[in-house]
Swiss-Prot record:
Coiled coil: none annotated. Transmembrane segments: none annotated. GO terms for cellular component: ribonucleoprotein complex; ribosome. Gene3D superfamilies: 3.40.1370.10. GO terms for molecular function: rRNA binding; structural constituent of ribosome. Belongs to the universal ribosomal protein uL4 family. One of the primary rRNA binding proteins, this protein initially binds near the 5'-end of the 23S rRNA. It is important during the early stages of 50S assembly. It makes multiple contacts with different domains of the 23S rRNA in the assembled 50S subunit and ribosome. It comes from Thermococcus gammatolerans (strain DSM 15229 / JCM 11827 / EJ3). It comes from the Archaea. GO terms for biological process: translation. This is Large ribosomal subunit protein uL4. The keyword Transmembrane helix does not apply. Keywords: Ribonucleoprotein, Ribosomal protein, RNA-binding, rRNA-binding. Pfam families: Ribosomal_L4 (PF00573).
Length: 255
């Protein structure tokens, strides 16, 4: 399968053969598992001190005294201690660091999930279903010349994105940036930001600096490409711009 390569003016200049990875069957189940596994590996285990609430010298006076048979401190006023309902007592079911919080996925399954997510970027129906605005995008997958890697000015990338037909999707991402409900906005997560186009390059020669200020835009090299970037929120079909060098590197990695 051949695809057109566009220059920075949005004009086709040549055709190249797509690697076989773009013919991978669509596997949303594996993509979802791979994304969730990536999420869980960022969770930090938490626990409580095993001796919290137990550092008291207590005694149980037993029955027959007309008072509850709970552990009490030895010195007056002999408050209840140690038990969960006492002041300073232990917690009932505290979190434990031994809890298994990671979800694993086999290496071959993770590789297949990434390949399937890459193939999904070439399916216009999946890209539209994900919510991207692609009315002016000339081709799927959208492949551009390697000169894009050297653009380091935000104003220049804005004009390039307009000519490539992806600026409408960046404006959609800007409109959908909302203030988060709840206390998360007081904890460094004030804004919920929509995901816009993904730019995949063979080598960063300035494009990260030139594109990072556009709302929703992510830039990544092929070697660091992961399923979370290709399918944010477990939803495959992200609008993706590939450079010619990135396509050639894909052939080396995935065939």
């Amino acid at each position: 399968m051949k695809v057109k390569v566009f220059n920075l003016e949005g004009e086709p200049v040549e055709e190249i053969e797509l690697p076989k990875v773009f013919s991978t069957p669509f596997r949303p189940d594996l993509i979802r598992r791979a994304v969730i596994a990536s999420w869980t590996h960022r969770i930090q285990p938490q626990g409580r001190d095993p001796l919290a609430g137990k550092r008291r010298v207590t005694e149980n006076i037993g029955k027959g005294h007309g008072m509850a048979r709970v552990e009490r401190i030895k010195t007056p006023p002999r408050f209840a201690a140690f038990v969960p309902f006492a002041r300073g007592g232990r917690r009932t079911h505290p979190p434990k660091v031994e809890k298994i919080i990671w979800e694993d996925i086999n290496k071959k399954e993770r590789r297949l999930a990434i390949m399937s997510a890459i193939a999904a970027t070439a399916n216009p129906d999946l890209v539209r279903a994900r919510g991207h605005v692609v009315d002016n995008v000339p081709a799927f997958p959208l492949v551009v010349v390697d000169d894009l890697q050297k653009v380091f000015k935000t104003a220049q990338t804005r004009e390039i994105f307009k000519k490539l037909g992806i600026w409408d999707d960046i404006e959609r991402a800007k409109r959908n940036t909302k203030i988060r409900a709840g206390k998360g906005k007081m904890r460094g997560r004030r804004y919920k930001k929509a995901k816009g186009p993904l730019i995949v390059v063979a080598k960063n020669e300035g494009i990260v600096q030139g594109a990072r200020n556009h709302p929703g835009v992510d830039v990544v090299t092929v070697d660091n490409l992961g399923v979370e970037l290709l399918a944010p929120g477990t939803h495959p079909g992200r609008l993706t711009i590939w450079t010619k060098g990135a396509i050639e590197r894909l052939k080396e990695i995935y065939g």
